[in-house]
Amino acid sequence: MSFWKVAAAQYEPRKTSLTEQVAHHLEFVRAAARQQCQLLVFPSLSLLGCDYSRRALPAPPDLSLLDPLCYAATTWRMTIIAGLPVEYNDRFIRGIAVFAPWRKTPGIYHQSHGACLGRRSRTITVVDEQPQGMDMDPTCSLFTTGQCLGEPDLLASARRLQFFSHQYSIAVLMANARGNSALWDEYGRLIVRADRGSLLLVGQRSSQGWQGDIIPLR
């Protein structure tokens, strides 16, 4: 089985400019690169600082301002999934930007329930709010989701994700800004869960299965 190392970025919501948010993302990218990660997932609306206080989301950012993340994905041979507003059905909703080594511009998707991808596949499958296993690309082996939840919503979400991983036999990586980011394997077993604070939750897949680690960032 091929080696695969993935990570979830976790940090408290922060209100700064888009330029500063991108710079903050790059700090996590460099930390993930030092761990030789091939995938890095950020929390929901990470490019807005994971800020849910606004009643209505702003328009999507100018994609040229995200060029540093495109360059980082190419430089470090890493797929990066960040959260941002997207236009969908004539309104602005939560979405994701996927920066990949093989892309010159980010792929933009509505976030919905999350996204599935595989170790060697270049396909990103966005999963609907009520996911069905048959809708997933068979090459997908990891489901990723970015969130910004506190209790009690976080506990309910974690239970759903654990059930999802077991039901559809797929590993699940959750990046949650407010703590308790986690990784479950394809059997629904919890591999690693973070506490609170600024950190990388790292998962490694090998012939022995999934293993996890927590890397604090200061």
Swiss-Prot record:
InterPro entries attached here? C-N_Hydrolase (IPR003010), C-N_Hydrolase_sf (IPR036526)
Q: Which cysteines are joined by disulfide bonds?
A: none
Q: Look up and give the organism this protein is from.
A: Escherichia coli (strain K12)
User: What is the annotated signal peptide range for this record?
Assistant: none
The primary gene name is yobB
UniProt name for this protein: Uncharacterized protein YobB
What Gene3D superfamilies would the database entry show? Carbon-nitrogen hydrolase
Domain named CN hydrolase is located at: 4-207
